């Protein structure tokens, strides 16, 4: 069974659409899970400085970096591609972790432990980014398994 986990610095997860994609991914034997992390120190760090905020995100995410998994950090200045390129990146991996930072983005050191990927040149709210990411995971699985969803 494949497992994709989306970790984000957020207080709560969206949304009915995410639940639909979670259900649809199961047909490809893929568990799609969302984990929202918002440690107490993050709110304070975000008020103090960008650097402290980024450090708090790294500290929240580091326990979930798995050397046996494909770790992907969503980053606006990273490589991007179409749905086929995204599916190629996911193909042949059983455990995939996605990381969505808070408003100040990632520390460079955290990015060294991940492959960085951008969903778009545009900036999205966390809620929209999660929906787009979940849909693209489902679309990638559809491409990999030659399901008619992706036409």
UniProtKB/Swiss-Prot annotation:
It is found in: Cytoplasm. GO terms for molecular function: rRNA (pseudouridine-N3-)-methyltransferase activity. Specifically methylates the pseudouridine at position 1915 (m3Psi1915) in 23S rRNA. One of its GO terms (cellular component) is cytoplasm. Its EC number is 2.1.1.177. Pfam families: SPOUT_MTase (PF02590). It comes from Helicobacter pylori (strain G27). It comes from the Bacteria. Homodimer. This is Ribosomal RNA large subunit methyltransferase H. S-adenosyl-L-methionine binds at residues 101, 119-124. Belongs to the RNA methyltransferase RlmH family. It catalyses: pseudouridine(1915) in 23S rRNA + S-adenosyl-L-methionine = N(3)-methylpseudouridine(1915) in 23S rRNA + S-adenosyl-L-homocysteine + H(+). It is an enzyme of class 2 (transferase). Its main location: cytoplasm. The gene is rlmH. Keywords: Cytoplasm, Methyltransferase, rRNA processing, S-adenosyl-L-methionine, Transferase. InterPro entries: Alpha/beta_knot_MTases, RlmH-like, tRNA_m1G_MTases_N.
């Amino acid at each position: 069974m494949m497992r994709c986990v989306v970790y984000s610095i957020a207080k709560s997860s969206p949304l009915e659409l995410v639940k639909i994609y979670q259900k649809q991914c199961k047909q490809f034997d893929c568990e799609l899970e969302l984990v929202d992390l918002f440690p107490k120190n993050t709110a304070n760090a975000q008020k103090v400085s960008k650097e402290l905020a980024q450090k708090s995100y790294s500290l929240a995410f580091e326990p979930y970096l798995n050397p046996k998994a494909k770790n992907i950090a969503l980053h606006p200045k990273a490589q991007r591609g179409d749905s086929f390129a995204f599916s190629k990146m996911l193909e042949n991996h059983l455990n995939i972790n996605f990381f969505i930072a808070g408003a100040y983005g990632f520390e460079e050191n955290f990015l060294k432990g991940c492959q960085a990927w951008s969903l778009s040149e545009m900036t999205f709210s966390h809620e929209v980014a999660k929906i787009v990411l979940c849909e693209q995971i489902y679309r990638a699985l559809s491409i990999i398994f030659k399901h008619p969803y992706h036409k």
